[in-house]
Amino acid sequence: MKTSSFIIVILLCFRIENVIAHTFSFDASLLNHGSGGIDLTLLEKGGQLPGIYPVDIILNGSRIDSRDIFFYTKKNRHGEYYLKPCLTRDILINYGVKTEEYPNLFRQNSEKNRDSSDCADLSVIPQATEDYHFIKQQLILGIPQVAIRPPLTGIAHETMWDDGISAFLLNWQVEGSHWEYRSNTRNSSDNFWASLEPGINLGSWRIRNLTTWNKSSGQSGKWESSYIRVERGLNNIKSRLTFGDDYTPSDIFDSVPFRGGMLGSDENMVPYNQREFAPVVRGIARTQARIEVRQNGYLIQSRIVSPGAFALTDLPVTGNGGDLQVWVLESDGTIQTFNVPFTTPAIALREGYLKYNVTVGEYRPSDDSIEGAYLGQLTAMYGLPWSLTAFGGIQVSEHYQGNALGLGLSLGGFGSISLDTIYSRGQQKGYSNEIGKTWRVRYDKSFELTGTSFAAGYQDSSAGYHSLADVLDTYRNGTAYRSYDNRIRRTTINISQALGEWGSVALNGGRDEYRDKVKQDYIGASYSNSWKGITFAVNWSRNNNIGDYYSNSLRTENNLNLWMSIPMKRWLGGDDKGVTATAQIQRITGQNTLYETGLNGRAFGQKLYWDIREQIVPGSKYDADTSLLNLRWSGGYGELTGMYSYNRNTRQMNVGTSGSMAIHSGGIAFGQKTDDTMALIAAPGIAGASVGGWPGVSTDFRGYTLVGHVSPYQENIITLDPTTFPDNTEVSQTDRRVIPTKGALVQAEFKTRVGNRALVTLTRKDGTLLPFGTVVTLERKTGEAFESAGVVDDKGKVYLSGLSEAGKLKAQWGTNSQCYADYKLPLKKGMSGIFLTRAVCM
């Protein structure tokens, strides 16, 4: 009797879609006083009813997934029923199973998933096993290694890639600033800046544009379109097709902007070990500053950073191997400018891998005074046996031709090295043809055991060598313009070292030499570490300019920055709201030393970030001691920023807003500013649910929002925080996996149950209770399918959730026995917080 009572309690709370229970055997004749008629065979055998269960997937001893799986009943060779998982083709492909090598995998099984997908019969794969542990909620799969593909690093299988939904997209960022100078006279200025990134997704096609607008006091506003292009991925050949404005790749030739068409390999579609790197821009901001990064005069990135060292690691991958022009627009009105020289790594591809690019179009310089000219470029790289890589290309235009040839070698544990040369024939405007050549050698190595990364490069050019841009830029508005400052030699070296608990250190340096005998040396070093929550960093850089062009005051510049961050939890207790104290010392050649202290933290559920700083500059003749306040509010519809600073002579105020929008077939959704690839969260009826741990990212009043920070061609997990759900709402699974293609808007749809919770007593028309174990389902709308809800206990009661105030239930037991019941909830809930009601099943 004790056992029977315990079973009744368990089944009272039993829900087919979300269940945690123990397995017991019992005699069905002891229940319902013999009135049964219900098939309890599975329960008698210690099994469970068919349905959808959340499980952890264990493949060959490793946990690889967690998801809802549909289980159906099947008999084993002893005639006993058991639950068998429905593993669809997409699921198995996602786990790396070679489904194409087993044509009968889905032919011998007539079962289908709830979405009509075929269920696999794993017995087709020799020695494959499956074992469902209901109590542990684990599905243990054993599949021979011969039936599984080698794991791909950093990429999902191609069959899982999702082009997303069609939509109109828009990212925006608007900023305004007011600056006042108070001395003998009062001066002021206002500056406004806006960035719009509209786009359209149609299937696998992407239309993208970047337009900026600038306006300063006394000047009219100026619009600038950085690019507009149409592109799509060609998954079967791991390539990308582009029409419009873009950049040629920089693997072999220097990159140039063009308007036309391009077809080339897309490294986002291949594993990490076959990819090349994207540049990283590092620097030091004295105040809160806006960082602008330009390539060939075009703005490609704009970002607000806090005072101290910064690193931009998410630059748009345009393939430009030339210098990046970086502008640091300080909040006190000063501007830092510097170039970031970065070189592509040594070329060494895996055997059999082909990387190519074909470009045809028109040269597209940012300077309108430069005349247009057609251009064409073809490059190819191929991995040969014996760890060799052959590569070459041709670059042509109206006044230029370049031919390249090179060879790379993988040295195994000693890194990789490549050597290439380019022969050029170019005619600058007003001058005769010049013929020259350049050669370069590149070496890269990462020592995983010691955490050391090393890269070095050397390039040397003859007097007659010119790049395509050097030649075409001389054709300006009908006048001759000769380029004299071409670089003839460059040496670079980069070293980084991980020191374990002692932090990390990095060193970079190099020299550029030009035809006018000007030389530029640069060297930088950094060290960072964390100890008991205290983070500190030291950054130093030195630029040395050699040549008659520079005055003595501009020959050498040193920049030293010391920064420290101390969490205040130790002094403020557990409820510290993430308050952190910061300190900074910065010394730049020719300027007074800056000392800064500050406090920052978060409030209102991480949505508000605040930052208070005090800057002291001893000895400054301008009395530059400054107080600053920075605020940023991160909400579900975007972000708001504000800054106020003042000292004796100046006052500055900045305000800004940014966000994103998507118009799709289901309506319109807003969110914080996103990347090019994004996810549309769809959790109908659940408003205000936090998403992914990002501050302020939450669903709107309909249960929708936009999320960036998703990687194309990779598996991304989108998570909802159940602690932020409104009352009377449930989600069967709080995480979803999405694998978007580049630029896609993929939908992460969560199955929600919104409504009241009730304990319903079901009886027949004659007053007798429905049999124990009766499965009760809920009809959402007229004509809509019934949804699994719960199981009746021995007293005719069933727990249901997601109920409206009135509706219809379907009860089913035995082989063909069923009835329908109309219910209506009472006005008040019971003591337990759920409704108690009765319904007659007819």
UniProtKB/Swiss-Prot annotation:
Record-level GO BP terms: pilus assembly
Principal subcellular localisation of the protein: membrane
The entry's keywords: Cell outer membrane, Disulfide bond, Fimbrium biogenesis, Membrane, Plasmid, Signal, Transmembrane, Transmembrane beta strand, Transport
Membrane topology: Multi-pass membrane protein
SUPFAM superfamilies: FimD N-terminal domain-like
Compartmental location: Cell outer membrane
One cellular component term from this protein's GO annotations in UniProt: cell outer membrane
Listed Pfam families: PapC_C, PapC_N, Usher
Annotated signal peptide: 1-21
Disulphide bond pairs: 819-841
PANTHER family: F1 CAPSULE-ANCHORING PROTEIN (PTHR30451:SF9), OUTER MEMBRANE USHER PROTEIN (PTHR30451)
Family according to the record: Belongs to the fimbrial export usher family.
Function summary: Involved in the export and assembly of the AAF/I fimbriae subunits across the outer membrane.
Protein name: Outer membrane usher protein AggC
Biological source species: Escherichia coli
Name of the coding gene: aggC
